[in-house]
């Protein structure tokens, strides 16, 4: 699956990384002779990329391997590229995926950040406005909040207590948004403690760094 996904990116067939063999079959139908199905991916998001050419090790793309894990192995502080989370189009790209919008679904996507109650209220208001204009709307939520939304499509990333599951489901859910032909997507933010930065990095790219902050 990893080799096929690399081939997929070279051919520029799709924007979202495949996380199941069925995704590879869909994207590369007729272009490859065989798919070896090892089941869904165990992690979901791509690897951590680290720059060791500067005075301090720097994470250029966050992944499942966190800066804390790297610090324990390297025996020194590992810093994080400030352009990972903040939108900064002036920075010269140093790692794959930093320049191009690789993770975007077809529909416009917005991340809503804030307290749980404020996020639910704002997303429902935004959904209602879109539906009034005849749009089909998806909400990316969690198991804890999914029943609070009134969108046409509600997709759960899993429980906030299981950030590994959130990472596993991310690309599958973005793909489902395309398959369901939604017109707009609103997503909760996912500031989880361990790999939350990697998850948010991918979501921010998918949303083109479009974020609504609410209290």
Sequence positions of predicted segments:
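Charged helix-capping and loop-helix junction motifs
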Residues: 18-23
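Short glycine-/acidic-enriched loop or helix-start segments at secondary-structure transitions
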Residues: 16-17, 45-47, 149, 196-198
């Amino acid at each position: 699956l990893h080799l096929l996904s690399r081939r997929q990116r070279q051919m520029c067939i799709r924007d979202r990384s495949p996380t199941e063999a069925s995704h590879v079959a869909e994207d590369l139908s007729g272009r490859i002779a065989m798919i070896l199905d090892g089941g869904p991916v165990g992690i979901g998001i791509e690897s951590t990329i680290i720059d060791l050419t500067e005075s301090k090790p720097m994470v250029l793309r966050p992944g499942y391997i966190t800066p804390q894990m790297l610090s324990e192995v390297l025996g020194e502080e590992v810093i994080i590229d400030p352009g990972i989370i903040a939108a900064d189009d002036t920075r010269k790209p140093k790692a794959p995926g930093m320049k191009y919008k690789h993770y975007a679904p077809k529909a416009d996507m917005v991340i809503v950040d804030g307290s749980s109650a404020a996020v639910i209220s704002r997303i429902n208001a935004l959904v209602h406005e879109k539906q009034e204009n005849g749009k089909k709307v998806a909400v990316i939520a969690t198991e804890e909040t999914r029943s609070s939304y009134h969108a046409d499509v509600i997709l759960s990333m899993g429980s906030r207590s299981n950030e590994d599951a959130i990472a596993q489901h991310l690309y599958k859910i973005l793909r489902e948004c395309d398959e369901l032909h939604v017109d707009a997507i609103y997503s909760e933010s996912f500031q989880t403690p361990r790999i939350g930065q990697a998850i948010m990095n991918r979501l921010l790219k998918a949303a083109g760094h479009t974020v609504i902050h609410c209290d």
